[in-house]
Amino acid sequence: MADQLTDEQISEFKEAFSLFDKDGDGCITTKELGTVMRSLGQNPTEAELQDMINEVDADGNGTIDFPEFLNLMAKKMKDTDSEEELKEAFRVFDKDQNGFISAAELRHVMTNLGEKLTDEEVEEMIREADVDGDGQINYEEFVKIMMAK
């Protein structure tokens, strides 16, 4: 996972990590993790932090070493990338930029992609993704359906 990071990213993470490794023993406490991540432009919730800590702190000693931290950051960066890609994809479908994908917009994009769909197929795709039943797909619904793939 961490091997997907650039040298530049690694040194940026090392710098941030070192700032919070007060005693220089190569470990930061789980409490400090949130502060480090926020300094790197991530904005994890308390619940996310707890999940990350449980995931990373393999020996359960309450501290995170730099290799563990790198793996964690690599994973977060990957998640952030795919979130950006999803937003971009949603914008492509949402032709009028009103925050919703209508049946007409879905049909238009699918046709441009070479997918000739019947009205029934388009309606079925909308129904599948349309959690709140308003006949169109909002961003949350779009993310849910895309992440399920």
Curated annotation (Swiss-Prot):
Detail which positions bind Ca(2+) 1: 21, 23, 25, 27, 32
Which compartments is it annotated to reside in? Cytoplasm; Cell membrane
Where would one find the signal peptide in this protein?
none
Q: Which residues bind Ca(2+) 2?
A: 57, 59, 61, 63, 68
Q: Does the keyword Metal-binding apply?
A: yes
What does the entry list as the binding residues for Ca(2+) 4?
130, 132, 134, 136, 141
**Which SUPFAM superfamilies does the record match to this protein?**
EF-hand (SSF47473)
Q: What is this protein called?
A: Calmodulin-1
What organism is recorded for this protein? Arabidopsis thaliana
Q: Which gene encodes it?
A: CAM1
